[in-house]
């Protein structure tokens, strides 16, 4: 009897111990589950926060490098960066540096990324990256993976509302333009030469606008007349750049131009869906004006000049072909053909023109070659904490050779100091893509 009672007591104790252990195990499991859930929640929270900081980190790095008008935004479809290269003399180099930074620290995870490049706060091109997943992993992004196009997608409407860092507005640039002119009109001398150093103040007060005030300082003048011996103003202009839907770009410039002209000039370019092809148009209403020192003499009568044509860009060789019908300053009307090949540090090509004067008489054919070269230094610009004007040589300089020595017909003007064949091609998508791939 005693043994039976003792056995029952032992069994009860064992059952109580098992119940205690089960309760302890359940409590321990619940505690561990709570801890794991909390850790997972914190990890997800910090991951989202880290993802948001990634775009901001890339923006801050670009600002430190000297890029202006920098910002970013993101939605469910893609992440978008906006930037303007004010740090490097060449757009291709600057855009390539920006791509490297964004690839390193600013790409979203498993989502497309777009970079919209501005010029004077006006969107020019976009670079688009689409990540490719292979075997449950994402390949490392490289420069060759970015598509370059005039197309901004649907991102610009959202990106234009973003508050940009390091604004380019109200910042003063002083660019010194070395200007060389040559002519061969006499037998006993090979060339007459004119060499000027022409500093220009450039500043923007609102989006797309640029004010240019240039002073021409003669260094050497042999054969170009007494007026060129005097210090006098050069370009005094206000320009407004704009972009319309369907890849239409334009620029309106008013003021005092070169070649002794003043007035207004409008340029409009349209790029087809096949971006190798484009339509080009230009309209000018100008009069004669010249400076004697700082006194301006002008004729109030105005004349119309115009140009309309098309262009084709050969991406394999970075070569631009254009054919245009034009009316020049002496009211002669004709056609002009140009072929320009663009390299990283220069652009060079030739041109040919044939026309008739205002009375219908044939004007002799003229042509020649032209080139534009990048000026040193080839590195970065520097702005001293935005307190002082940034002083540099102009990005490039060029010459036009008149093979038939035509002095009267086929004359034209340059509306803005920075207008040249190299600058006009600086945002060409095919050229930017070649810069990304080759350098």
Residues covered by each model-derived region:
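Bacterial N-terminal signal peptides
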Residues: 35-47
